[in-house]
Amino acid sequence: MSDLISYDDVIDAAYDIFLEMAPDNLEPADVILFTAQFEDRGAAELVETGDDWVEHVGFDIDKEVYAEVRIGLVNEENDVLDDVFARMLISRDPEHKFCHMLWKRD
């Protein structure tokens, strides 16, 4: 296996992919909200990889190779990312690029 990409690079890649795909996968109001408030409240956070990903992708997840990133808006009162616009599973292996996103649905 090749060297895994850093968690910082995973977050950057996830955010770039999110920005590219958000207009096609989120409600227009959510895109406007995220764009308007990202400067003050936006976040892309690495979180513990959820055990539910196998249900979404159909294969077992090696938590050393795959990382989960959540992208959304932080609640200013408690500094918690509680308005999640997307969850992304992304491979850290540069030889086997993969990502799968779960989008916010109203």
Swiss-Prot record:
NCBIfam families: PRK05094.1. This is Putative double-stranded DNA mimic protein VIBHAR_02752. It comes from Vibrio campbellii (strain ATCC BAA-1116). InterPro entries: dsDNA_mimic_put, Put_dsDNA_mimic_sf. Belongs to the putative dsDNA mimic protein family. May act as a double-stranded DNA (dsDNA) mimic. Probably regulates the activity of a dsDNA-binding protein. Transmembrane segments: none annotated. It comes from the Bacteria. It holds the Pfam family DUF440.
